[in-house]
Structures are given as structure tokens and as C-alpha cells.
């Protein structure tokens, strides 16, 4: 069951200086190619970070959930353009603040920059693991690893047999770089091995908590 963690005093202070907005599921929050001027903080919900090729085919790079910053690239180098699309995976409540105002807050309380920096370091580690998985794991391994990662996210729900997640076969394919049909075949194989159960968008990953 998803819970809302108690908020850190520094983050609470930071949020008091932000504009808070709510977005419905499937809303596009950031468009690739637009000028980067705003930092975002996810209070509730989850978003997908994705890129598109010239034909409009999407690849999901990662999911972000409550407590995550995003849109930070232009904070450190002016004139940056957004490099990825951000879309709401579920209804979201998001704090938004201009880079200019955030830089002013850093002067008052540098701890907020440490929060952001710690997240960026963890995200870099996750990206390194993702690149390694793409290079060294076959598609079955990539899908299995993706399911394990999703089972650890805040929106995963406890289930008597493990953790329950909601994701489509198309979304899994966009994350690991394969077709929806391939995902379906591998999920069936994982079911036959009694590692998961999959019914529509609902997947239970056994033995995870």
C-alpha cells in the first residue's frame, strides 16, 4: 500500500516557495526541445521520462515517483533545451520553481542543493546500471530486472505473494527496447516459472517486499 512519507523540514521550506499544480494522468509536463527554465518536484504521483526517434517511436528511460526532482539540467548550464519528454503516468501534484528563484533559495539554505545533488548521484548510478543491463542482459533478463525495479517503487502495492505493479506490455517494451509481443511471450514464460502472475496491466512479482 502506498504511503506518503513524512516530509523533511528543508523540503517543507522549499515547497513553501514553489507553485503547486495538479495534472491528470497522461498530461505532458515537459516537451523535448523547449527552453529549460523551471525545476520540478514530484509531491504525489509518478511520471515517465521518455525520448522519441525521428519516426516518433518512444522509449521510456525511467519512471520518477513522489519525492523526485526533475527538469534540473538547465539549472547548471544556462540556455539548455529540454532533452526528454515528461508525461504523467498517474494523477500528479507537482511543485514548480524557476531556476532564478531556486538559486536564490540556495543562498539562504544550501541544504536544498544537497537534496538535489544526492538524487542526481543516485540517478546517475541507476542510469549506469540501465546501460549495463542493455549491453549485457538478454531481453528476458532486462524485463525481469525492470519488473524487480518497478516493484521497489513507492506506487507498487503489497500483495500476499509479493509486490503488485500496474504497467502495460507496451510500456515494458518501451523501457527495455523490444516489441509488445515479445514482452507478452516473456511474461508468459515467467508465469510458467512461477516468478510472476500477469493479468492485463496488473503484474504480481513474487517474493518481493
From Swiss-Prot:
Keywords: Acetylation, Activator, cAMP, cAMP-binding, DNA-binding, Nucleotide-binding, Transcription, Transcription regulation. Residues 179-185 bind DNA. 3',5'-cyclic AMP 2 binds at residues 135-136, 170-180. Signal peptide: none annotated. One of its GO terms (molecular function) is DNA binding. Pfam families: cNMP_binding, HTH_Crp_2. GO terms for cellular component: cytosol. It comes from the Bacteria. Residues 52-58 are annotated as: Activating region 3 (AR3). The modification N6-acetyllysine is found at residue 100. 3',5'-cyclic AMP 1 binds at residues 56-62, 71-73, 82-83, 127-128. The keyword DNA-binding applies. Residues 137-209 form the HTH crp-type domain. Residues 19-21 are annotated as: Activating region 2 (AR2). The N-terminal domain binds cAMP and is responsible for homodimerization, while the C-terminal domain binds DNA when cAMP is bound. NCBIfam families: PRK11753.1. A global transcription regulator. Complexes with cyclic AMP (cAMP) which allosterically activates DNA binding to regulate transcription. It can act as an activator, repressor, coactivator or corepressor. Induces a severe bend in DNA. Acts as a negative regulator of its own synthesis as well as for adenylate cyclase (cyaA), which generates cAMP. Plays a major role in carbon catabolite repression (CCR). Homodimer, which upon binding cAMP is able to bind DNA. Binds the N- and C-terminus of RNA polymerase subunit RpoA and sigma-70 (RpoD). This is cAMP-activated global transcriptional regulator CRP. The gene is crp.
